[in-house]
A protein has these predicted regions:
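Terminal catalytic/cofactor-binding subdomain
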Residues: 1-137, 142-144, 159-162, 176, ...
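Extended, compositionally biased non-globular segments
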Residues: 273-334, 342-348, 354-362, 366-370, ...
Length: 484
């Protein structure tokens, strides 16, 4: 969620927000605890959600706890998401701030002073910037996605991943919301997704950029997927000394001689240095390192998982050699897995949309990306046939077209119409209303990016141009459109 000053529209790092958020939740009788980092509160944990920060104090994120699916599942998730949004908007008032309905702030600095001021002090960033040479500050202007997570059986994991990757152009076009950067039109409807070549292009290891490029072909199974991710030519990220899931904050070790993860796992031990104190250590390869490294790619979708029981590393490596071997092993180990969709830009109901499309469409904005992905994965065989019909390589080209032109491109619009048809067929009738926003965008040809550009161009030459966006494009409290 892109935080903006409620009077000027400027990018605005939060200060008192988390204390205020705890108070808002406690006043409703919700138990919560603060999440601390370097003696500063960077999040609030409740049973229903994790409310925290992405890479900067100017970019909030909320991750809801998993909910049971089935008929009405999206409505239940939508009610929770709107409750969390309401809490966020109320707490932001303490900082004189609001959420701007954009997937990237329209005019935010990215210089060294701003980066030092607003970047969250996570240990992982020392490795990414200081060792790997990422231009991490490219994303410090609050680039935001509406990440959607849908559980899938492990036997269908690779198929589901291929579906979401292959059909990403439709989600990019439907939920495009970042046409502006540094106070100027970028020529893209979804400029947010230009981030990866800019972050990785100057990086120390060419393999980092490889893991953000649309794959040359679909993945045959999970073994194929992880061979692609951990292959020679890539370089392992730093690895934990013990098994834990807070990968952005855990002490880790940078391996000497920069091996790929595949080479490290086949060695009994590897020398390296701790990222927190520089101490030389030996790291013994373990199945936890395979599980930990799942976040190492930056495509439009990831397979995310946890294993109830970690297998012995030799057993994992043996299973990895055989087609379907990881799927079978993970099932035995009690896998809990889902597809993380990363293509949709962040979007919220604002006054512009409410005035144009009405309350039913406004209420569906938060859930529409989830409805598209859930519908496709519930109808995965038809969705995979759609990928085959359109051709994998051609779909990769359309992804770039969707970033630039959105639904103005006839091919992207035709693909999107077919994607929504397949998704609709995969949803229970009770959840079909969650596609209302996606339907509206397709039928009108106007995404949030188009609506934002109309307002922006209409106030050209005004010194307070950012402030003039707020009446139409600040996220509305759900009370305004019947979301609560």
């Amino acid at each position: 969620m892109v935080v903006a000053h409620a009077q000027t529209g400027a990018s605005h790092p939060v200060h008192a927000y988390f204390d205020a958020l705890r108070q808002v939740k406690q006043d409703r009788g919700v138990a919560c605890r603060p999440v601390m980092l370097s003696d500063r509160c960077v999040g609030v944990h409740t049973q229903a959600a994790e409310c925290g920060l992405d890479n900067g104090f100017n970019l909030l994120e909320t991750a809801t706890a998993p909910l049971d699916g089935g008929p009405g599942g999206l409505a239940r998730l939508g009610a929770l998401a709107h409750r969390e949004l309401a809490d966020t908007l109320e707490a932001l008032q303490v900082d004189g701030a609001c959420v701007l309905n954009v997937a990237q702030h329209p005019d935010c600095p990215r210089d060294a002073d701003w980066y030092a001021r607003v970047c969250v002090p996570r240990p992982i960033y020392r490795e990414l910037v200081g060792y790997r040479g990422w231009h991490h500050w490219i994303g410090i202007d609050a680039k935001a996605q509406n990440g959607v997570n849908v559980a899938v059986p492990v036997a269908r994991a690779a198929l589901s991943l291929n579906v979401v990757l292959g059909l990403a152009a439709a989600s990019i076009a439907l939920f495009a919301n970042s046409p502006l950067e540094s106070g100027k039109s970028t020529g893209f409807k979804e400029n947010r997704l230009t981030i990866w070549p800019r972050v990785f292009g100057p990086a120390r290891f060419a393999g980092d950029a490889l893991l953000a490029k649309y794959p040359a072909r679909p993945f045959r199974d999970l073994g194929d997927y992880f061979r692609w991710m951990f292959q020679p030519g890539t370089v392992s990220r730093s690895l934990p000394l013990d098994h834990r899931y807070d990968y952005k904050s855990a002490p880790t070790v940078i391996l000497d001689r920069d091996p790929c993860l595949m080479d490290f796992l086949h060695a009994s031990a590897w020398p390296g240095r701790r990222t927190d104190n520089g101490q030389a250590v030996q790291v013994s390869a373990h199945a936890m390192h395979f599980e930990h490294s799942q976040i190492g790619q930056f495509l439009d979708a990831r397979w995310r998982y946890r294993l109830e029981t970690l297998p012995p590393l030799p057993v994992l490596l043996q299973a990895w050699k055989h087609e379907g071997g990881l799927e079978a092993l993970f099932a035995e180990c009690g896998v809990d897995g889902y597809i993380e969709g990363r293509a949709p830009g962040a979007g919220f109901a604002d006054a512009c949309l409410l005035g144009e499309a009405g309350g039913d469409v406004a209420r569906s904005v938060l859930m529409a990306p989830m409805a598209v992905q859930l519908g496709l994965l519930n109808n995965a065989d038809a969705a995979w046939q759609l990928v085959r019909d359109w051709d994998w390589e051609r779909l990769g080209e359309l992804r770039l077209t969707a970033m630039r032109d959105g639904l103005a491109d006839a091919r992207v619009r035709a693909l999107t119409a077919e994607v929504l048809s397949v998704a609709q067929a995969g949803l229970p009738e009770a959840d079909a209303p969650c596609l209302a926003y996606a339907r509206y965008v397709l039928e009108s040809g106007r995404s949030a990016a188009d609506r934002l550009l109309d307002t922006w161009n209409g106030v050209s030459g005004c010194e307070d141009r950012l402030a003039r966006l707020l009446p139409q494009h600040a996220a509305l409290h759900p009370d305004r459109f019947g979301g609560l």
